[in-house]
Amino acid sequence: MADFDDRVSDEEKVRIAAKFITHAPPGEFNEVFNDVRLLLNNDNLLREGAAHAFALYNMDQFTPVKIEGYEDQVLITEHGDLGNSRFLDPRNKISFKFDHLRKEASDPQPEEVDGGLKSWRESCDSALRAYVKDHYSNGFCTVYAKTIDGQQTIIACIESHQFQPKNFWNGRWRSEWKFTITPPTAQVVGVLKIQVHYYEDGNVQLVSHKDVQDSLTVSNEAQTAKEFIKIIENAENEYQTAISENYQTMSDTTFKALRRQLPVTRTKIDWNKILSYKIGKEMQNA
């Protein structure tokens, strides 16, 4: 280990550690962080050098956070990043400090949001909240309104997760949707991501994403929001159905082709009988 430490610079160690952290499966950040911490054996170097990786992970994963005094959780995303570890909660019109390691919010302050797009953002937010409530048992969403390159833009982010460490699996759904307010029609651009990790007696990960494009009729705020949500619903239903069908096909064909159902002898092994033989033999020898 000493030779390894001598050969690898602190900069390279931090780069490797950051790589592990940013690729941590959903719901397993703490486990990966603790393992990396043991390997690096230098807390100051890890906290200072890999702090950017903590932030990247939380923004990429759309980590939801509860702010004390406010009912709804908000997502940590690049679209709400105000710098200096402060993030925007457009629904509650506040900014807050976020600890990327502890995943805790603090110091909420009033913040100007929407950039003159208040009615557009609120219409889309209201419609999206209703959709998420209907389709996700543990879902959260945040809607931003921004002017990007002179274009008035609505950005909608959705996150839903199920963490079941006692059953050896964790999973997260993320989707991001954008459109510019350019009557009479606008292009909707979306990306959908699924990441699931199953690790009982093995290590299997599903990492999937799909890019979506569609056209949207831009009229008044309420009607446009309704059409926007309809596009989201159709695309996400189609994606989920395709994933389910693909895995059923793999289960019926691909996975079965990977191994024999019976060994070469064409006889199933009775493991319980073998175990009883072994125990009996050991008792005789005793």
UniProtKB/Swiss-Prot annotation:
Domain of life of the organism encoding this protein: Eukaryota
GO biological process: actin cytoskeleton organization; barbed-end actin filament capping; cell junction assembly
Protein location: Cytoplasm, Cytoskeleton
Annotated GO MF terms: actin filament binding
Modified residues (N-acetylalanine): 2
Phosphoserine modification, residue list: 9
The entry's keywords: Acetylation, Actin capping, Actin-binding, Cytoplasm, Cytoskeleton, Phosphoprotein
GO cellular component: cortical cytoskeleton; F-actin capping protein complex; WASH complex
Pfam family for this entry, one: F-actin_cap_A
Modified residues (N6-acetyllysine): 19, 97
Subunit text: Component of the F-actin capping complex, composed of a heterodimer of an alpha and a beta subunit. Subunit of dynactin, a multiprotein complex part of a tripartite complex with dynein and a adapter, such as BICDL1, BICD2 or HOOK3. The dynactin complex is built around ACTR1A/ACTB filament and consists of an actin-related filament composed of a shoulder domain, a pointed end and a barbed end. Its length is defined by its flexible shoulder domain. The soulder is composed of 2 DCTN1 subunits, 4 DCTN2 and 2 DCTN3.
Similarity comment text for this entry: Belongs to the F-actin-capping protein alpha subunit family.
Function: F-actin-capping proteins bind in a Ca(2+)-independent manner to the fast growing ends of actin filaments (barbed end) thereby blocking the exchange of subunits at these ends. Unlike other capping proteins (such as gelsolin and severin), these proteins do not sever actin filaments. May play a role in the formation of epithelial cell junctions. Forms, with CAPZB, the barbed end of the fast growing ends of actin filaments in the dynactin complex and stabilizes dynactin structure.
Name of the molecule in the record: F-actin-capping protein subunit alpha-1
Gene name of this polypeptide: CAPZA1
